[in-house]
Amino acid sequence: MTKIYIDGDACPVKDEVFKVAGRYGLAVTVVGNAWLRLPQDPMITMIVVPEGPDAADDRIAELIEPGDICITNDIPLGSRCLIKRALVLRPNGKPMTENSIGDALATRDLMNTLREIGTMTGGPPPFAKADRSRFLSALDTMVHQAKRVVP
């Protein structure tokens, strides 16, 4: 059965995930390096990992299986999940796919380089109400896709 994993430390759509998962009876695991207040629901669990770079990502990549869904903005984690035949959705509602992940990794590396040399100093645009709406719709669609991967 499909499970949803949330890269939880800075995820702005946890409540939306809980809502959609509840509608479909899906288990949700939030992974982060600090305890978060979560709804009291037997289908929602929290895994706290030690602090450190990529500790949460490593745990999600270890647990995720084909047909599961990962909610993350982390492109390398998204790539690792796609390799395991999981589905990946960004909090802004844009999916990461096998077709888009290569470009996303290259763009990420380019942006890191530009920031390092001081050419670019900004980050991503702020999270907007339209992103939340797009996310809800995309997650609903992705749940149906996941059911086709793992009946």
UniProtKB/Swiss-Prot annotation:
Pfam families: DUF188. Transmembrane segments: none annotated. Belongs to the UPF0178 family. This is UPF0178 protein amb2838. It comes from Paramagnetospirillum magneticum (strain ATCC 700264 / AMB-1).
